[in-house]
Design a protein with these regions (language model features):
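Glycosyltransferase-associated regions of secretory-pathway enzymes
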Residues: 1-119, 135-262
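Small-residue hinge/turn detector
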Residues: 120-131
């Protein structure tokens, strides 16, 4: 039943790696060339309404991206034409949370000093408000999302080896009780500030702490959504001196020790 999806995953990886290698030459010739990710874009084909809205959500520190990141975006759009697209940069994330959530939640979010931790929290909040499918900026679908997410799904999470939940793909209806639980746990983690790393403070560690994979709808990542096929750390953070969050968290506290002054 899943053999065709596994084959598709391998073919996508092969194609994506070819484009990634060619992109080194492209950016060697045009080192300053960047492509713009749209703030919003409609679905290419109209699809029937479902509990999980047909919207792909992404975020990044900038909307000006290298060729591999842009190709990753285009691939998702082509593979899932019945889904609209929404994108927010760092400043837009803060504006969204300020406009749609309580001062308590906004102040907690504002204490996060690393972009990846902010993005972890934002994805929960934007899905809780509007619903849809969150994808990391380097994540791509393996199979059309309209087929992966069934009409009966109200939420869907991916698991990796050893049944570990992760958060680079999340599909959810608005007002999801499980997302509410995750949001409360992130709030508690920020308030207590006893966790050193992003992974357990705001990321997949929270999912594995709060949710039981046996009691929620899950799908295996290799037949659903993968990361890093089209792009890599070099192309993602070429314009960010701080580098990837895995390095930044050793230089900057994840949580600001005192709330920012109003």
């Amino acid at each position: 039943m899943t053999a065709h999806k596994i084959l598709a995953n391998r073919l996508i990886k092969f194609f994506a790696n070819m484009t990634k290698m060619l992109s080194y030459g492209f950016h060697a010739l045009l080192p300053n060339k960047r492509f713009t990710l749209p703030e919003r874009s409609g679905a290419l084909i109209k699809g029937k309404d479902r509990p999980v809205p047909r919207i792909i959500w992404q975020t990044n520190f900038t909307n000006k991206v290298t060729l591999p990141v842009y190709l990753n975006y285009l691939f998702n759009r082509i593979l899932s034409p019945t889904f609209a697209y929404r994108f927010m940069i760092t400043e837009a994330r803060a504006d969204f949370i300020s406009a749609n959530y309580s001062p308590e939640i906004f102040n907690a979010y504002s204490r996060l000093q690393i972009g990846a931790a902010q993005a972890d929290f934002w994805r929960l909040l934007v899905l809780q408000k509007y619903g849809g499918v969150y994808l990391d900026i380097d994540a791509h679908a393996v199979w059309p999302l309209g087929y992966t997410i069934k009409p009966e799904h109200e939420e869907l999470y991916i698991i990796r080896q050893k049944n570990e939940l992760t958060n680079y793909f999340i599909a959810s209806k608005p007002d999801n009780a499980n997302l509410a639980r995750l949001i409360r746990q992130v709030m508690q983690n920020i308030e207590e500030d006893t966790i050193a790393g992003v992974y357990d403070m705001t990321g997949p560690g929270v999912f594995n702490q709060v949710l039981d994979y046996q009691n929620i709808p899950t799908t295996f990542y290799r037949i659903t959504c993968n990361q890093g096929s089209f792009t890599n750390e070099h192309f993602q953070y070429i314009d960010k001196p701080q580098g990837k969050w895995t390095k930044e968290q050793y230089k900057v506290d994840v949580v600001r020790k005192t709330p920012p002054e109003s």
